[in-house]
Amino acid sequence: MLPSELVKYKKKSQKIIALTAWDSISGSLAEHSGADIVLVGDSLAMVCLGYKSTLPVTLENMIYHTNAVSRGFSKEIEEQSLLVCDMPFLTYQCGENKAVEYAGKIIKNTYAKAVKVEGADPEVQNVISRLIRMGIPVMGHLGLTPQSYLNLGFKQQGNNSESHEKIKRDALSLEKLGCFSIVLEHIPELLAKEIQTELEIPTIGIGAGKFCDGQVRVTADLLGLNDKQPPFCRPIIDGKKIFGEKLKEWVAAEKLN
């Protein structure tokens, strides 16, 4: 799967599904599920590294985990899910040259075929434009941007007229810059619908309603492995309880042997 193929999905009204992964096991599960995109998100900071936010995760962490995820893939490379790696905090906010260097390290040192960048402030737009000119495909991310939680909090964005219009403008700008898709996180459903209608590139929602061209979920949230669940992700199983009880049963049984 190449990034450019996702536009064809939108034209055919074919739903796009993305799952996150952080190691070879979760990568294998995500790929075998039939997900079109496997995202190595900086959410791994909380999912598997124990941090309280995405901010502490480093470029080295992202490269390490992206390589681990790719080793879980079993299909030929042209048949694999599209592997996308998040650019972590302060790898693209510190100037275009550094951003190109860091994104280049991701693409050169992993099997990722694209990077994801949060936000659309003028400086970020300059970085995105430069990366795309250098041949690095970019997925945008608007709405609730976790790397900006110190300013914005973990709350829904776009729910007043000013932020509503800003997110729409930013989405159009990212498309014009050449992003191949945009993640819309935790915004009102009708705003997501407006953006989906106006853009030619696909929108991939998380907590943005049913009108996006696709959906992305943190796999650990779907499997019920986290103590705290986001309000927009209902687990498909209570994984922490199920697996925890089974492990307790095994440990207790082994102690009796």
UniProtKB/Swiss-Prot annotation:
Reaction it catalyzes: 3-methyl-2-oxobutanoate + (6R)-5,10-methylene-5,6,7,8-tetrahydrofolate + H2O = 2-dehydropantoate + (6S)-5,6,7,8-tetrahydrofolate
**Organism's domain of life?**
Bacteria
| EC category name | transferase
Q: Name one GO molecular function term.
A: magnesium ion binding
Q: A Gene Ontology CC term for this entry?
A: cytoplasm
Cofactor names from the entry are: Mg(2+)
| Active site (UniProt) | E185 (proton acceptor)
- Which pathway is recorded for this entry? Cofactor biosynthesis; (R)-pantothenate biosynthesis; (R)-pantoate from 3-methyl-2-oxobutanoate: step 1/2
GO terms, biological process: pantothenate biosynthetic process
What's in the keyword line of the UniProt record? Cytoplasm, Magnesium, Metal-binding, Pantothenate biosynthesis, Transferase
Cofactor, free-text remark = Binds 1 Mg(2+) ion per subunit.
Task: Name where it's found.
Answer: Cytoplasm
EC number of the protein: 2.1.2.11
Pfam families from the xrefs?
Pantoate_transf
Where Mg(2+) is bound, by residue?
A: D42, D86, E118
Give me the segments passing through the membrane.
Answer: none
Q: List ligand-binding residues for 3-methyl-2-oxobutanoate.
A: D42, S43, D86, K116
Known role: Catalyzes the reversible reaction in which hydroxymethyl group from 5,10-methylenetetrahydrofolate is transferred onto alpha-ketoisovalerate to form ketopantoate.
The record's note on quaternary structure and interaction partners says:
Homodecamer; pentamer of dimers.
What does the sequence similarity comment in the record state about its family?
Belongs to the PanB family.
Q: What protein name is recorded for this chain? A: 3-methyl-2-oxobutanoate hydroxymethyltransferase
Organism source for this protein?
A: Prochlorococcus marinus subsp. pastoris (strain CCMP1986 / NIES-2087 / MED4)
The opening ranks of the lineage are: Bacteria, Bacillati, Cyanobacteriota, Cyanophyceae, Synechococcales
- The gene behind this protein is panB
